[in-house]
């Protein structure tokens, strides 16, 4: 994990996906992944680096480039970008979107003060540049928790429906 946030976790997730594919009672064409925050980062890496395994991913408020995340947290594990460019680039989903094959749903709150909205904007730019189709939903003025009013109900209903439709 040191100097390589996401590398070993992604390898584990892909290995788990492969193990699931080998089970007689699992449809290998219906394996998906979802996550929020760091989990959204992992889902984004899984659908790109594990493109042959995962047919769908939902990423809520994902880190897509460690250069945009809280430097006190990130540099504790990764050092600075100048000291560890390979660690930053080798584990940022934006650098692997060309491999993506499955359905991808990106969700973010525009007022997120933890994983800044810029992460999703960077992912969108990378996906468009690679001519990858994806789904996107932005919650205006919602923070990292995406809650308030009917927001949480809306979010979970939308994610549930996405899984039903795409797996």
PLM regions with names:
Residues 1-167:
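Active-site-proximal cap/loop segments of hydrolase catalytic domains
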């Amino acid at each position: 994990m040191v100097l390589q946030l996401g590398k070993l976790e992604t390898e584990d997730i892909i290995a788990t996906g492969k193990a699931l594919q080998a089970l007689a009672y699992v449809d290998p064409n219906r394996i998906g992944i979802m996550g929020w925050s760091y989990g959204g980062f992992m889902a984004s890496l899984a659908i790109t680096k594990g493109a042959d395994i995962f047919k769908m991913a939902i990423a809520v408020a994902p880190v897509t480039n460690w250069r945009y995340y809280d430097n006190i947290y990130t540099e504790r594990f990764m050092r600075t970008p100048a000291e560890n460019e390979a660690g930053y680039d080798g584990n940022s989903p934006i650098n692997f979107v060309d491999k993506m094959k499955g359905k991808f749903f990106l969700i973010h709150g525009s007022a997120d003060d933890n994983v800044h909205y810029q992460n999703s904007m960077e992912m969108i730019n990378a996906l468009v540049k690679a001519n990858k189709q994806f789904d996107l939903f932005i919650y205006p003025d919602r923070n990292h928790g995406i809650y308030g009013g009917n927001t949480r109900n809306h979010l979970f209903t939308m994610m549930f429906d996405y899984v039903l439709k795409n797996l």
